[in-house]
Amino acid sequence: MKTILNKLINHEVLSKEEAKNVLINISSGQYNPSQISAFLTVFMMRSITIDELSGFREALLELCIRIDLSAYNTIDLCGTGGDGKDTFNISTLASFVAAGAGIKVAKHGNYGVSSISGSSNVMEKMGIKFSNDPSFLEKCIDQAGICVLHAPLFHPAMKNVGPIRKELAVKTFFNMLGPMVNPSFPQNQLVGVFNLELARMYAYLYQNTNVNFTILHSLDGYDEISLTGPTKIITSHMEGMIKPEDFGIRLLSQTEIEGGKTIEESAEIFTNIISGKGNEAQNNVVCANAAMAIATVTKCSPQEGFELAKESLFSGKGLKALQKLQELSL
């Protein structure tokens, strides 16, 4: 590790193989917490390269517990987090709305590190069982249209890193990796990223896979469609922008999509919205993100996806998906 750290301190970059090997060594407990912390810190002070990101990703996918859900043509709706915006759990809510619209969802998530309440925090609070048992996860998709993949159950190699990330409480390159290391290898992916540079890197890496992808970045910094301004969209076949008026809705202010100050508050906001009791801003931002997931899988237009998402939310289909998952978790 000393050699690697000296290399990084000298403003050199790692090759793909070096990046992969470092992460494998971290996972096998070869480095102490101080060394791991120093390594993570370097990448907070400069941009990660494509080779480094690719090497880290390969290591995590090699070490993870894989789950085969290929029979379902699933999508994962996942943001990198680390955008510092502290919104409510938009992508998790959008996942249930998409499931209510008939899309099969394999939601990869974790506890919040740089945010108050990550996807797993709110799912746990809602009584959702975390499991890596294939038959349970298949039953969830069969009956609820969605399963929850709690990252630590599938990436046990990262147990050495979890406490350090929590103590640092800022975004690290693991935020960038999260959406790319779904252990079920979904055929479709809706990814939100916290800056344009990362959006380009993701696009480059996904172009070399068979994944049908949509990458999102709101130009004012959100890792999802925020409706607070235009959102950059990159897919395997196009690149463009989408604005609130494209969905026929108004521009939102940042305060309208803020999350709770505690996990309890976050769960309360989640329950209100999925039950159809959210306010206009909350409903619109959830449906806009669900719309992009629906459009990614079905190839309908985002506008058509938005109508399908609204129907799922307001008819209670999204809520039914959540209730079924809660029932299966008992």
Swiss-Prot record:
Pfam families, alphabetized: Glycos_trans_3N, Glycos_transf_3
SUPFAM superfamilies: Nucleoside phosphorylase/phosphoribosyltransferase catalytic domain, Nucleoside phosphorylase/phosphoribosyltransferase N-terminal domain
BP terms from Gene Ontology: L-tryptophan biosynthetic process
InterPro entries, per the entry: Anthranilate_Pribosyl_Tfrase, Glycosyl_Trfase_fam3, Glycosyl_Trfase_fam3_N_dom, Glycosyl_Trfase_fam3_N_dom_sf, Nuc_phospho_transferase
Binding site for 5-phospho-alpha-D-ribose 1-diphosphate: 79, 82-83, 87, 89-92, 107-115, 119
Database matches in Gene3D superfamilies: Nucleoside phosphorylase/phosphoribosyltransferase catalytic domain (3.40.1030.10), Transferase, Pyrimidine Nucleoside Phosphorylase, Chain C (1.20.970.10)
Binding site residues for Mg(2+) 1: S91, E224
EC nos: 2.4.2.18
Cofactor(s) of this protein: Mg(2+)
Residues bound to anthranilate 2: R165
Cofactor note: Binds 2 magnesium ions per monomer.
Residues reported in the UniProt entry to bind Mg(2+) 2: D223, E224
Catalytic activity line of the entry: N-(5-phospho-beta-D-ribosyl)anthranilate + diphosphate = 5-phospho-alpha-D-ribose 1-diphosphate + anthranilate
Family: Belongs to the anthranilate phosphoribosyltransferase family.
Function field: Catalyzes the transfer of the phosphoribosyl group of 5-phosphorylribose-1-pyrophosphate (PRPP) to anthranilate to yield N-(5'-phosphoribosyl)-anthranilate (PRA).
Protein's UniProt name: Anthranilate phosphoribosyltransferase
Organism of origin: Flavobacterium johnsoniae (strain ATCC 17061 / DSM 2064 / JCM 8514 / BCRC 14874 / CCUG 350202 / NBRC 14942 / NCIMB 11054 / UW101)
